[in-house]
Amino acid sequence: MSQIKKVVLAYSGGLDTSIIAKWLQEEYQCEVVTFTADIGQGEEVAPARAKAEAMGIKEIYIEDLREEFARDFVFPMMRANAIYEGEYRLGTSIARPLISKRLVEIAQETGADAISHGATGKGNDQVRFELNAYALMPDVKVIAPWREWDLLSREKLMAYAEEHNIAIEKKKGKKSPYSMDANLLHISYEGGIIEDPANEPEEDMWLWSVSPENAPDQPTYIDISYEKGDIVAINGEAMSPATVMEYLNKVGGENGIGRDDIVENRFVGMKARGCYETPAGTIMLKAHRAIESLTLDRNAAHLKDELMPKYAEMIYNGFWFSPEREMLQALIDQSQDYVSGDVRLKLYKGNVIVVGRTSENSLFDEDIATFEDDGGAYNHKDAEGFIKLNALRLRTAAKKRR
């Protein structure tokens, strides 16, 4: 332990990571550098500075990474229509590569020997943080206190905090029984009564959205503009990636959009139940598929759909910086060259309904697709040979097996 002289800690300013900071100082007798990222979690990050200073920490990094998170991580993922196991929109998974990236960069800037995080030994986050870190800094030393210490209960953590004069916030009102994680893309809930998959979540658990039953009785219409697969404007107003997500979270939440209750298969081998609110992500996925339906070639679209589950699994498992994810990303990005245009959506009581889409790159030819007289644009007789050729193997097999 004495070989470690300086550690960069992913620091939220909360009780757990404050305890980790003090534990690192005591157990490793090392200097601690804290890194706090604002990725849209909706909490004030500035108090993290005072808390770190109270523990004698000198090098403190507090950074607003919302635009980088949206632009370089969420938007590329949205081009792929990525969703894990058909339901999970990867809100936590996609945030970890950026945090790992900055941890490694700060370690290199400060000459640190190691990085540290507060992920537990049961979850996926320990894997994500560390795989992403090793991909960027192969020889980095990672300290994961939850895999080393014996502070394995809330009571032991509280006792440690009191013994070492670590401030314990006493929030007014009812304390949430859930473990929560939030960023621009989502907020997640685990623990409490929802550890039992049979229990319906209580309504007051949800923080970002009204229930669909209590959403407005009148629909909200929005127009989303795309350029090469990315949203560039809403209702005619140009917006940055982070601003897009903030707006869609607000309008989506107001209309009861984005609630998911999932039992997912964790990479570490267990099943876990989580509840998620992903208003912006839900709207973005629906709108992106709508503009692709107009502009992507059929076989290109089908190939993307075949590759998407693997791409989503890479992100979920922590392989954002892997060669296979980067290879797939290049293919996905190339597919978006003509994915530009506008999508009109109706938001109503938890539903995202596509009501219109237009594009100068549209592959929809009304002259061919019409049910009216097409003036010879499509020769119906061509279908006969097409059908017979496709039926050839079926007819041959049927004759042989009689």
From Swiss-Prot:
Q: Where does L-aspartate bind?
A: 120, 124-125
Q: One Pfam annotation, family name?
A: Arginosuc_synth
Residues reported to bind L-citrulline: 88, 93, 124, 128, 179, 188, 264, 276
Query: What pathway or pathways are given for this protein in its record?
Result: Amino-acid biosynthesis; L-arginine biosynthesis; L-arginine from L-ornithine and carbamoyl phosphate: step 2/3
- Matches recorded under InterPro entries: Arginosuc_syn_C (IPR048268), Arginosuc_syn_N (IPR048267), Arginosuc_synth (IPR001518), Arginosuc_synth_CS (IPR018223), Arginosuc_synth_type_1_subfam (IPR023434), AS_cat/multimer_dom_body (IPR024074), Rossmann-like_a/b/a_fold (IPR014729)
Gene3D superfamilies from the xrefs?
A: Argininosuccinate synthetase, chain A, domain 2 (3.90.1260.10), HUPs (3.40.50.620), Single helix bin (1.20.5.470)
Spell out the molecular function terms from Gene Ontology: argininosuccinate synthase activity; ATP binding
Q: What is its main location?
A: cytoplasm
Record has Ion transport as a keyword: no
Residues annotated for ATP binding in this entry = 10-18, 37, 118
Task: State the EC number(s).
Answer: 6.3.4.5
Per the record, the domain of life is: Bacteria
Spell out the reaction equation it catalyses. Answer: L-citrulline + L-aspartate + ATP = 2-(N(omega)-L-arginino)succinate + AMP + diphosphate + H(+)
Q: What class of enzyme is it?
A: ligase
Q: Which GO cellular component terms, listed alphabetically, does the Swiss-Prot or TrEMBL entry include? A: cytoplasm
Recite the UniProt keywords alphabetically: Amino-acid biosynthesis, Arginine biosynthesis, ATP-binding, Cytoplasm, Ligase, Nucleotide-binding
Q: Where in the cell is it found?
A: Cytoplasm
For the biological process aspect of GO, one term held by this record is: L-arginine biosynthetic process
- Family per UniProt? Belongs to the argininosuccinate synthase family. Type 1 subfamily.
Name the HAMAP family on file.
Arg_succ_synth_type1
Subunit structure, interactors included: Homotetramer.
Name of the featured protein: Argininosuccinate synthase
List the source organism.
Hydrogenovibrio crunogenus (strain DSM 25203 / XCL-2) (Thiomicrospira crunogena)
Q: Which lineage is the organism of this entry classified under, starting from the top rank?
A: Bacteria, Pseudomonadati, Pseudomonadota, Gammaproteobacteria, Thiotrichales
